[in-house]
Amino acid sequence: MHEVRRATDADRGQVATTLGRAFADDPVLRWLAAPDDGRYARTGPRAFDALLRVTYMPKAEVYMTADGNAAVVWVPPDSWKAPVSHTFKLLPPYLRLSGRRIGRLLKLVTAMEKRHARADEPHWYIPFIGTDPAYQSKGLGSALLAHVLARAD
């Protein structure tokens, strides 16, 4: 069994790096990110770090495996909507990540917020769960899900 613990602000860099690696080949993220000229290796983890610092660490629950190779962001009911000030704080890392594709990213964020607003009942939301590719298929993601789903049920 893999040990899971709540991430602290001191873990933010590790969580951002892990999620950055986990999503490096994600089709949606690749569509949002600027064409990869080696830029994503720098901008991906930085964007995750900014999201964690500005939006998720203050109001969500972030868990990681004890070895730091997998992480999940778990947003409580009715906590998914970020203030407009967060968008302004996130624009610099979003621009570094997306470049000229910034419009795609902002449209996706807006569409997701509209979808949440139409939800029939309060719900927990997982915007990100990921495992460093070098450690995938070892049950780390399952351990994270089991940990948080036990509380949600």
Residue ranges of each PLM-predicted region?
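Conserved beta-hairpin
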Residues: 53-74, 130-132
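Anion (oxyanion) recognition and catalysis
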Residues: 153
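Conserved acetyl-CoA-binding loop-helix of GNAT-fold acetyltransferases
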Residues: 131, 137-150
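A short beta-loop-alpha structural element at the N-terminal edge
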Residues: 3-17, 21, 28
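A short, aromatic/hydrophobic, helix- or strand-capping loop or linear motif
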Residues: 27-35
